Amino acid sequence: MATKTVKVTQTKSAIGRLPKHRATLTGLGLRRIGHTVELEDTPSIRGMINKVYYMVKVED
């Protein structure tokens, strides 16, 4: 059975954001506005998404 995934898209710039939030975007694999990555839906990934919820859009 395939693992559940979630699509995350960066919608706002990381310029002027807290360094921890920039690092979280990098950890999610996001590089620029409009960049989309598909990640496994794990509690750790969900925690990272919750940390930068105001800069990303999530699709299940």
Swiss-Prot record:
Assembly mode: Part of the 50S ribosomal subunit.
UniProt similarity note: Belongs to the universal ribosomal protein uL30 family.
Name of the coding gene: rpmD
GO biological processes: translation
Disulfide bonds: none
Originating species: Shewanella sp. (strain MR-7)
Protein name, as recorded: Large ribosomal subunit protein uL30
Gene3D superfamilies: Ribosomal protein L30, ferredoxin-like fold domain
InterPro entries: Ribo_uL30_ferredoxin-like_sf, Ribosomal_uL30_bac-type, Ribosomal_uL30_CS, Ribosomal_uL30_ferredoxin-like
Keywords: Ribonucleoprotein, Ribosomal protein
GO cellular component, one term: cytosolic large ribosomal subunit
GO molecular function: structural constituent of ribosome
